[in-house]
From Swiss-Prot:
The keyword Transferase does not apply. It is found in: Cytoplasm. InterPro entries: Heat_shock_Hsp33, Heat_shock_Hsp33_C, Heat_shock_Hsp33_N. This is 33 kDa chaperonin. Under oxidizing conditions two disulfide bonds are formed involving the reactive cysteines. Under reducing conditions zinc is bound to the reactive cysteines and the protein is inactive. The keyword Electron transport does not apply.
Length: 292
């Protein structure tokens, strides 16, 4: 099944909701970066959240970046997504081994530890919007919930989950974001809080084979759910040799000449998808000639 996001409203548009299945996204990231299970879970949660948040943006060229800088062994995470829910990301450290959490789960909170979440929205204006909040738990879903409440003043419930197979491949991944709009009635707020408090974890829903539509129906069915849109989402990197060449030009002729003088090919790595691009000495000479 291909990954996708469902966009919906409920309670006469007092609630807006997103639910996502992201198993292929997270497995693609795991394969690209060869991550250990706790890193797969951390990166997978941020990729899932990023895909849904990307789909919230209006402009075709809008770009969202989620960055976590942290003191834990993972070192940090970076995810970018566009309005079409194309998403990519990487961890600073791909292999982290930690004992399970007290609940017997992958200890993402310990892998991240203390840190800061930055949300950067580039909407083609002079300056991008930047919102920053401290990590609350390092479990990512709670950290995004806190970001929405403090930086965007939108009461939200974010749930993100990644479940692994014994062979360390991704069994299932997904999540939801449910938000109360400013005119939500007190009765709706109380009922929704009660409902969210009753549900099992999002991973157990996904593990049962529940689709994003079924997850939203379970959560919001009694509020009068209206599904608005089904958006495909995937792990996509837009790096090309031409784009990498532009990056090489930007380092300046002096450094470029030093590379040529070394008489060895150079290899440039894309952090997001881990693709390596090799440039021979002849190609480097050609680049410097064309940049004159």
């Amino acid at each position: 099944m291909n990954d996708y996001i469902i966009r919906a409203t409920a309670a006469n548009s007092q609630i807006r909701a997103f639910a996502c299945i992201s198993t292929e996204i997270v497995e693609t990231a795991r394969q690209a970066h060869n991550t250990s299970p706790v890193v797969t879970a951390a990166l997978g949660r941020l990729l899932t959240g990023g895909a849904m948040m990307g789909s919230m943006m209006k402009g075709e060229k809008d770009l969202l970046t989620l960055k976590i800088a942290c003191s834990g062994p993972i070192g940090g995470l970076t995810v970018t997504a566009d309005a079409g829910a194309n998403v990519k990301g990487y961890a600073n450290q791909n292999v982290v081994n930690l004992p399970p959490s007290p609940k017997g789960k992958l200890d993402v909170g310990k892998a991240l530890d203390i840190g800061v979440l930055s949300v950067i929205k580039d909407m083609g204006l002079k300056e991008p919007y930047v919102g920053q909040t401290d990590l609350v738990t390092g479990e990512i879903a709670e950290d995004l919930t806190y970001y929405f409440a403090t930086s965007e003043q939108v009461p939200s419930s974010v749930a993100l989950g990644v479940l692994m197979n014994r062979d360390n491949t991704v069994r299932c991944a997904g999540g939801f974001i449910i938000q109360l709009l400013p005119f939500a009635e007190e009765e709706v707020i109380e009922k929704l809080e009660k409902k969210i408090g009753e549900i099992t974890s999002v991973t157990s829903m996904l593990d049962k084979g529940m689709t994003p539509e079924e997850i939203l129906q379970e959560l919001l069915g009694e509020f009068g759910l209206t599904i608005l849109d089904k958006i495909p989402t995937k792990f996509t990197c837009n790096c090309t040799k031409e784009r990498v060449e532009k990056a090489i030009v930007s380092i300046g002729k002096k450094d470029l000449q030093e590379m040529i003088d070394d008489e060895k090919p150079i290899e440039v790595n894309c952090h997001f998808c881990n693709t390596n691009y090799e440039f021979s000495v002849e190609e480097l000479k050609d680049i410097i000639t064309r940049s004159n």
